[in-house]
Regions:
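Short, Lys/Arg-rich flexible segments
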Residues: 1-106
Length: 106
């Protein structure tokens, strides 16, 4: 009696890596949306500048507007709005679900 085995390890690892990338992208998009909803608006420049990026391990949200740290963290007696921090930390269950869904569909 003879058995033949096929090693699918590379295909499985590739599918998992793609699923992780999809999950991180979904998390980044959703986190960006949450941050934009929390951002105070005067001209809309700060809100419109918020974007996301991903790498192999994480999703990031941020902005390149020079006055963003003052709105986020506060300055001169003004309380910070913490819109980026809150977008990242107040929705962890949702982000976990997004990653789980992505991995289930791998």
């Amino acid at each position: 009696m003879s058995y033949t085995y096929k090693d699918n390890t590379d295909e499985v690892l590739s599918a998992l890596e793609k699923a992780k990338k999809r999950g991180l992208e979904a998390i980044g998009l959703v986190a960006e949306g949450h941050a934009k909803k929390l951002t105070p608006v005067d001209t809309g420049r700060l809100r419109n500048s918020i974007s996301h990026a991903t790498d192999y391990e994480a999703a990031y949200i941020g902005t390149n507007v020079e006055y963003a740290p003052y709105v986020e963290l506060g300055a001169r007696g003004r309380d910070g709005k913490h819109m980026l921090q809150r977008a990242a930390t107040e929705h962890t269950d949702e982000y976990k679900r997004l990653m789980e869904d992505s991995m289930k569909n791998a």
